[in-house]
A protein has these predicted regions:
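C-terminal catalytic lobe of FAD-dependent flavoproteins
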Residues: 12-37, 42-45, 366-368, 374-375, ...
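Glycine-rich Rossmann-fold phosphate-binding loop(s) that bind the pyrophosphate
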Residues: 159-163, 300-302, 461
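Ferredoxin-type iron-sulfur electron-transfer modules in oxidoreductases and energy-metabolism complexes
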Residues: 25-38, 64-65, 69-104, 108, ...
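A conserved FAD-binding loop/helix module that cradles the flavin
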Residues: 305-308, 315, 462-490
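FAD-site-proximal beta/loop scaffold in flavoenzymes
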Residues: 260-293, 393-466
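Feature captures the FAD/FMN-dependent oxidoreductase FAD-binding
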Residues: 150, 155-159, 207-256, 371-385, ...
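Glycine-rich dinucleotide-binding loop and its adjacent helix/turn
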Residues: 132-150, 208-229, 251-315, 438-452
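Beta1-alpha1 glycine-rich phosphate/pyrophosphate-binding loop at the start
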Residues: 5-32, 41-44, 68-80, 90-92, ...
Length: 493
């Protein structure tokens, strides 16, 4: 703790965001980092707590409190303040192999659990300190390829090149195993590449990291649909172990009349089409699902729904409405949601901010769902019947509550519908191809990341269900240790 009074003397200062009217003109990242000296001052705000909840990563009330990767946050906060950037890079990378991802897309569980935030109302800028450290590492040449000095002679196949797959591949390669990553898409990155829009995570950031992994000896095979066009038994026969890290990509659908209308898409398919067209041709190929001049209805109030709102606005939509089943959260913590739990409070994300700037109002309508889709004579969606919901006890014995219709309904016009209602588990064909068991939740059943099939492991959302990138990285790290132990009889990961 280089400056014991830092949290009292220095105000929280974050990066500058480009104004909504300016940033919606393109799909570029829109945060302007602080100058290095100002970022160093932010490091002084860390209190080096005796019990640093920021790095705890423990479950409280069913949600994570603090960093799931157990990042050494007080250490590198102080190193930032001291200007010891080289050492800060080293200590950050001790627990997080991909800070360039988490410093952009993580919701900052660390800051929600920050003691400084609890005592002063302004948490330490942990996420932006992390971003400054990793970008310094690249700019200074510290983050370059470092292949393992020896090889074990063991080979591992990783199926899926999302955050969990990249993490498990990186750790196993560092251990000396020969790793091949199979990805069914045309680019490496999984959710990071096609599920998160470019303005949140520019794809050159992914490519920069993947190029280092390639130089370190990891082999990437794209357009390889293992369990589909690429037989699972070929992959299993060619390797000593296989890790399934295919994510939770089975989208939750809306079971309503008119669902077969044209112009209704799952959010991930919409976002994928936009990013692929951007990367392939700068949109000149015309292959992106377009929201231009359309009245857009987004079903789902989470991060993916927000990404759809921001993407549709950048495409020039005529209007955008976002439905959220749950009630509007409070603006401040309630007594039932005490620190250091994750704060269940109202958040207006970048997409909603942009909708407010462009259309003059928040796009969200709470406690609503679609009862019916309307379509015109050509079969194109042209509107939706919206049902209002309320929370009621549906099981007197347990007190379980659910959102149920109130009977109040209203109609809206829309000619593009994006379903962002979450995911129900993994797409089962990969699991079936390998013969691994699934749980009732649609995830792969496991015991310490090992499936019921010998030498076949699993990690990430495919194992734990839909979650955050930071959890996928934690899963990959922990799974790598179990795979290594299976191959070598012990592990030093």
């Amino acid at each position: 703790m280089g400056k014991p009074t830092g949290f009292m003397e220095i105000a929280r200062q974050t990066s500058t965001e480009l104004p909504p009217e300016e940033r919606i003109q393109n799909f570029n990242e829109f945060h302007i980092p602080l100058p290095q000296d100002e970022q160093q001052a932010q490091g002084a705000r860390c209190m080096d707590c005796g019990v640093p909840f920021c790095q705890a990563g423990m479950m409280i009330g069913g949600m994570a409190s603090g960093c799931p990767l157990n990042n050494l946050i007080p250490e590198w906060n102080d190193l930032v303040y001291q200007g010891k950037w080289d050492l800060a890079v080293h200590r950050l990378r001790a627990t997080n192999r991909f800070p360039e991802f988490t410093s952009r897309v993580c919701p900052a569980l660390c800051e929600a659990a920050c003691t400084c935030g609890y005592t002063t109302g302004s948490p330490v800028t942990v996420k932006e300190n992390e971003h400054a450290i990793v970008e310094y590492g690249y700019e200074s040449g510290l983050l370059t390829a470092c292949p393992p000095p020896t090889r074990t002679g063991k080979t591992v196949a990783v199926v899926g090149a999302g955050p969990a797959g990249l993490a498990v591949a990186d750790y196993l390669n560092k251990r000396g195993h020969k790793v091949t990553v199979y990805e069914r898409e045309d680019r490496v990155g999984g959710l990071l590449m096609y599920g998160i829009p470019n303005m949140k995570l520019e794809k050159q950031v992914i490519d920069r990291r993947v190029n280092i992994m390639k130089a370190e000896g990891i082999n990437f095979v794209t357009c390889a649909d293992v369990g589909g066009r690429t037989p699972a038994h070929d992959v299993l026969d060619a390797h000593d172990a296989v890790v399934l890290a295919c994510g939770a990509k089975q989208a939750r659908d809306i079971n309503a009349p008119g669902r077969d209308a044209q112009g209704i898409y799952f959010a991930v398919d919409y976002l994928t089409s936009v990013t692929r067209s951007l990367l392939d041709s700068g949109f000149s190929d015309g292959k992106a699902v377009s929201a231009k001049d359309k009245k857009v209805l987004v079903i789902g109030g989470g991060d993916t729904g927000n990404d759809c709102v921001g993407t549709a606005i950048r495409q020039g939509c005529a209007s955008v409405t976002q439905l959220e089943m749950m009630p509007c959260p409070p603006t401040e913590r309630t007594a039932a949601n005490a620190w250091p739990e994750w704060p269940k409070v109202l958040k207006t994300d970048y997409g909603q901010q942009e909708a407010i700037a462009v259309f003059g109002s928040d796009p969200r309508i709470y406690q609503t769902t679609v009862k019916e889709f309307y379509k015109d004579e050509a079969g194109q969606v042209c509107g939706a019947l919206i049902a209002k919901l309320e929370s009621k006890v549906v099981d007197e014995a347990t007190g379980r509550r659910a959102m149920v219709p109130t009977g109040e309904e209203f109609a809206i016009e829309c000619n593009l519908v994006l379903i962002a209602a979450g995911f129900t588990g993994c797409q089962p064909y990969v699991a079936e191809a390998f013969g691994v068991d699934l749980t009732k939740r649609g995830t792969v059943a496991d015991t310490k990341y090992a499936t019921n099939v010998p030498h076949v492991f699993t990690c990430g959302d495919m194992r734990r269900g839909q979650s955050l990138v930071v959890w996928a990285l934690r899963e990959g790290r922990d799974a790598a240790a179990e795979v290594d132990k299976s191959l070598m009889g012990y592990t030093n990961l």
